């Protein structure tokens, strides 16, 4: 085979590959377009069945949520403080108990 025939065969092969790629691309685009239309119809159907909230209402919910989050943070801080305070009081009570036992021992020793 000479160079000219090889180039012609190569060009034909490239043409067939390009046709195949074009056909697969067209199928993919067609399927994507069909899916997009079906999804749009489904969205319209769902929007009719389940109404969405207005932007103002959603903003009110966000503000309410933010307020509750702030209150929750404040409560968590207070709970942490009270837990620490309770722990400190328990330690203080233990120290008092130890001191009271020492005082009792000392007074018992002094009496005897």
From Swiss-Prot:
Q: This protein's superkingdom? A: Eukaryota
- Coiled-coil ranges per the record? 55-105
**What are the protein's UniProt keywords?**
Coiled coil, Endosome, Transport
Record's keyword annotation contains Coiled coil: yes
- TM segment ranges: none
Q: Give the GO cellular component terms, alphabetically.
A: endosome
Q: Where in the cell is it found?
A: Endosome
Question: Briefly, what is this protein's role?
Answer: Component of the biogenesis of lysosome-related organelles complex-1 (BLOC-1) involved in endosomal cargo sorting.
What family does the Swiss-Prot or TrEMBL record give for this protein?
Belongs to the BLI1 family.
Q: How does it assemble?
A: Component of the biogenesis of lysosome-related organelles complex-1 (BLOC-1).
Q: What is this protein called?
A: Biogenesis of lysosome-related organelles complex 1 subunit BLI1
| The species this protein was found in | Eremothecium gossypii (strain ATCC 10895 / CBS 109.51 / FGSC 9923 / NRRL Y-1056) (Yeast)
Question: Highest lineage ranks of the organism?
Answer: Eukaryota, Fungi, Dikarya, Ascomycota, Saccharomycotina
Tell me what gene encodes this.
Answer: BLI1
């Amino acid at each position: 085979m000479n160079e000219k025939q090889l180039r012609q065969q190569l060009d034909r092969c490239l043409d067939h590959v390009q046709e195949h790629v074009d056909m697969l691309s067209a199928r993919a685009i067609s399927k994507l377009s069909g899916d997009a239309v079906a999804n749009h119809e489904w969205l319209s159907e769902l929007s009719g069945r389940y109404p969405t909230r207005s932007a103002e209402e959603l903003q009110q919910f966000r503000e309410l949520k933010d307020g509750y989050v702030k209150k929750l943070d404040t409560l968590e801080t207070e709970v942490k403080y009270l837990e620490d305070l309770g722990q400190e009081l328990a330690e203080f009570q233990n120290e008092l108990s130890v001191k009271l036992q020492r005082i009792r021992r000392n007074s018992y020793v002094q009496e005897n």
